[in-house]
């Protein structure tokens, strides 16, 4: 099968970004994939501005000022509610950035690393700062990224390294650094875990006083508590020394298995869930030899002829976030209620900043069950305010790690969607982009491999419509096809 420039470019945009923006469609038949890749790289250069969000800090002194336990309980509840709302707002702003930013490659990689270095923490500032690490360092050196993430307050808190001290080592952080972040299971021993945990003793974070002259006053930063560090000799992965945490990171990066593990995970995410071991080995060798240069690894993948092989196209079930952003990049949406978007993510099974566990989110068929598939296929109409949501979030499943969310976050009526989302579509640009196109041409922009039977059903459904109504219904129906779930 000979693929057109349009097909190749759409494939590249869905993998290296979040699909095409509406205004990009006319140029996709003219650009070569190499030109489009160069544009994606150029658009993601430079440091991104931080997505701002604030944590409300409740101190012991604040509570002691209050006269009764009831007043103190009320203040705690208020702060907890404000924290949840701010966390939802942060997630909503990132989703909006994914949708509208030209730096698609940067945001896509930040999303990938968000799943790789998964944390589930309620502190807004911890989430904000870790997200910024992903966005700033996600295309640079994996060595720098790994060290920055390992020293982040979010990771140290989530994996309990704040409690790791020489008198009583805590192995959580040391284990996950090897199992999930670098080597993968089976490439280290329990002795290595214990020795690494000793090396990471004393790694912690501390608060910067709000009245400090420091630029990060009121926030937290990495802090090495020397008194809690075990400075004795350690044996780790066959090497001996008085290792500190940085030494463990360095030794892990010396292992070619780390390059294999990361290259394999990136291949399965961006290319095909069925691994090609020879290609992964070749990629991992180049990744290792480059000093773990993430951008070079991605270029090796996204410019390779095999990336555009038919078996690697349209083979990936879109994650809920992918699906939301894909639709939003074609339909200019205004969503007035961040809470509604949060609830919708819960229904679909993927909530930004709330991965199910330290292993991150699953892939593939894990996204699809009988109820979620129905909602996914209704999603274009729900977002356009044309249809109500008839499935409520699951408050006690594995996505929530067995923890029910507060009732005010999930207590919704079955037909809530148009009111709660407060969503509107600016249809003018959509009509301008699609009105002169046949249904087959419209489908070529929205579906990887349009099926004749499906297009026939859409054609039949819109045959009596004309003008703007026909365009709107054609686009919504194409986005509601099972084929649109693949990218």
Predicted regions located by residue number:
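N-terminal accessory alpha/beta regions
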Residues: 22-128, 133-135
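Substrate-binding/catalytic groove segments of enzymes
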Residues: 122, 186-188, 452-454
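Active-site substrate-binding loop specific to GH73 endo-beta-N-acetylglucosaminidase modules
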Residues: 72-74, 90, 126-335, 339-343
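Generic detection of long, well-ordered alpha-helical segments
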Residues: 2-3, 26, 30, 85, ...
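Flexible, low-complexity segments enriched for small/polar residues
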Residues: 2-5, 10-24, 255, 259, ...
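Hydrophobic residues in alpha-helical segments
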Residues: 26-29, 40-41, 99, 134, ...
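Short, compositionally biased low-complexity segments
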Residues: 7-15, 59, 67, 82-84, ...
């Amino acid at each position: 099968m000979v693929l057109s420039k349009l097909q190749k470019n759409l494939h590249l945009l869905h993998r290296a970004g979040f699909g095409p923006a509406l205004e990009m469609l006319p140029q996709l038949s003219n650009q070569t994939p190499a030109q489009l890749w160069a544009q994606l790289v150029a658009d993601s250069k430079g440091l991104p501005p931080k997505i701002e969000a604030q944590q409300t800090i409740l101190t012991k002194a604040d509570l002691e000022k209050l006269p009764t336990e009831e007043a103190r309980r009320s203040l705690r509840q208020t702060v907890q509610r404000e924290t949840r709302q701010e966390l939802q707002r942060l997630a909503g702003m990132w989703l909006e950035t994914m949708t509208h930013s030209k730096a698609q490659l940067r945001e896509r990689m930040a999303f990938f690393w968000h799943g790789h270095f998964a944390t589930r923490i309620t502190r807004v500032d911890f989430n904000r700062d870790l997200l910024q690490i992903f966005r700033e360092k996600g295309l640079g050196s994996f060595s720098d990224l790994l060290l920055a993430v390992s020293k982040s307050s979010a990771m140290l808190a989530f994996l309990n390294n704040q409690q790791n001290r020489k008198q009583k080592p805590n192995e959580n952080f040391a284990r996950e650094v090897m199992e999930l972040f670098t080597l993968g299971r089976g490439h280290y021993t329990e002795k290595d875990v214990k020795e690494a945990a000793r090396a990471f003793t004393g790694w912690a974070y501390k608060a910067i006083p709000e009245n400090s002259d420091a630029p990060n006053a009121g926030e937290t930063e990495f802090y090495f508590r020397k008194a809690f560090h075990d400075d004795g000799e350690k044996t780790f992965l066959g090497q001996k020394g008085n290792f500190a945490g940085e030494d463990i990171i360095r030794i892990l990066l010396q292992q070619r298995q780390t390059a294999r593990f990361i290259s394999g995970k990136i291949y399965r995410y961006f290319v095909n869930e069925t691994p090609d071991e020879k290609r992964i080995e070749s990629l991992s060798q180049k990744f290792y030899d480059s000093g773990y240069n993430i951008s070079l690894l991605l270029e090796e993948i996204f410019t390779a002829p095999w990336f555009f092989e038919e078996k690697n196209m349209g083979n990936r079930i879109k994650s809920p976030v992918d699906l939301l952003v894909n639709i939003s990049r074609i339909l200019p949406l205004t969503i007035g209620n961040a809470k509604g978007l949060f609830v919708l993510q819960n229904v679909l099974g993927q909530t930004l900043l709330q991965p199910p566990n330290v292993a991150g989110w699953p892939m593939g068929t894990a996204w699809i069950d009988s109820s979620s598939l129905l909602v996914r296929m209704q999603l274009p109409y729900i977002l356009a305010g044309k249809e109500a949501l008839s499935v409520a979030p699951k408050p006690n499943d594995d996505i929530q790690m067995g923890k029910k969310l507060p009732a005010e976050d999930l207590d919704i009526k079955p037909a809530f969607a148009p009111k709660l989302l407060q969503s509107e579509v600016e249809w003018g640009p959509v009509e301008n982009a699609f009105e002169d196109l046949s249904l087959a041409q419209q489908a070529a922009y929205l579906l990887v491999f349009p099926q004749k039977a499906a297009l026939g059903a859409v054609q039949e459904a819109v045959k009596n419509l004309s003008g703007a109504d026909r365009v709107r219904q054609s686009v919504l129906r194409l986005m509601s096809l099972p084929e649109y779930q693949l990218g």
